[in-house]
């Protein structure tokens, strides 16, 4: 942060704003709200409120392309999870199979039961380790048997903590009930399309 702040006076319009490291602070609409005070309306895009959100990797790749003509051909990928022998960050050519990258991290300490593109909260499950690293792959995770299986669901006690933790104040218990009932009209009334699937309510 200190290094970035040295550039504030040198680049017109640049302002460095440190934010608390609280999940899901990196969510696009969450960032916009905390930086500008604006809420992106339901069904709208950041551009509709005058914002463009780019992560650091994208900005760095754009700068490299402008300066050298070299397109994005590799990514820095975090390799982690309970089944990974030696977690770490690795520069990986796009298109490399996940199996090769896991091998570079020492292989598996136990047979993986779940593989993910992305983080543990919003990652996407993949069927096998032969899936390629993509240009938007920031992390790959491998979990053993203990972490791979969700605990049994328990009955809601209506404590309201899920609503308090939702960055958009959605009523997740009502959304879940409407989903189970197949009530599309209720889901629309509950603004289910605003949900970013961050998992905070769970």
Where do the PLM segments sit?
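Ferredoxin-type iron-sulfur electron-transfer modules in oxidoreductases and energy-metabolism complexes
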Residues: 137-153, 163, 167-202
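Generic beta-strand/beta-sheet core signal
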Residues: 19, 80-82, 93, 116-118, ...
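Flexible, glycine/charged-enriched surface loops at secondary-structure junctions
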Residues: 16, 74-76, 109-118, 185-190, ...
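Active-site gating/interface segments in enzymes
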Residues: 24-26, 30-36, 106-160
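Glycine-rich phosphate/pyrophosphate-binding loops
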Residues: 1, 111-113, 173
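Hydrophobic alpha-helical positions that pack around
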Residues: 1-98, 104-109
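Short glycine/threonine-rich loop-to-helix capping motif typified by GTGT followed
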Residues: 2-10, 125-132, 202
């Amino acid at each position: 942060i200190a290094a970035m702040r040295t550039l504030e006076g040198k680049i017109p319009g640049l302002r460095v704003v440190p934010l608390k490291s609280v999940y899901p602070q990196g969510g696009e609409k969450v960032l916009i709200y905390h930086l500008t005070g604006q809420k992106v309306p339901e069904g709208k895009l950041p551009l509709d409120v005058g914002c463009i959100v780019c992560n650091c990797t994208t900005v760095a790749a754009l700068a490299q392309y402008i300066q050298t003509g070299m397109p994005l051909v590799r990514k820095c990928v975090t390799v982690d999870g309970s089944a990974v022998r030696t977690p770490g960050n690795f520069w990986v050519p796009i298109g490399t199979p996940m199996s090769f990258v896991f091998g570079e991290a020492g292989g598996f300490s136990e047979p993986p039961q779940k593989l993910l593109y992305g983080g543990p909260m919003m990652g996407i499950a993949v069927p096998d380790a032969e899936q390629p690293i993509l240009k938007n792959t920031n992390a790959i995770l491998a979990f053993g048997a203990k972490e791979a299986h969700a605990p049994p669901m328990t009955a809601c006690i209506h404590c309201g903590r899920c609503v308090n933790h939702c960055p958009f104040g959605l009523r997740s218990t009502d959304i879940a009930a409407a989903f189970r009932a197949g009530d599309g009209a209720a889901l629309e009334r509950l603004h289910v399309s605003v949900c970013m699937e961050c998992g905070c309510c769970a």
